[in-house]
Amino acid sequence: MLEHESKERQDAYEAVFTALAHPVRRRILITVYFNGGSMTAGQIAKKFEQAWPTTTRHLQVLEAAGLLRHRRQGRSRHYRLDCRRLELVRDWLAWFSRAPG
């Protein structure tokens, strides 16, 4: 962890990197991106061969990391990409490109 970063920011990095560590969650983000940036939970689940609770858990982790947001429409949950956390991580990674050595 970078000592100059706030605890809140460090927690945000941790949540994003944890979410992105799983290949299925990365594929979910890519799938949503290539489907216009928004999909229902049911549409996402159909793209992956796994149990519904597993898909739901992946969506919860992505949402907790701030990478997806959802809104309810009737009985459906519509998930939308939220790239602000990715920008935060991009800036964190850019810091290392300027590091000495």
Regions found by a protein language model. Give the residues of each.
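Amphipathic alpha-helical dimerization/coiled-coil segments
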Residues: 1-13, 30-34, 83-101
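N-terminal helix-turn-helix DNA-binding core of bacterial DNA-binding proteins
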Residues: 11-51, 73-85
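Short, hydrophobic-biased segments on the C-terminal half of alpha helices
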Residues: 59-60
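Glycine-centered, phosphate/nucleic-acid-interacting loop/turn motifs that mediate DNA/RNA or nucleotide
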Residues: 66
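Short beta-strand "wing" residues that participate in macromolecule-binding interfaces
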Residues: 70
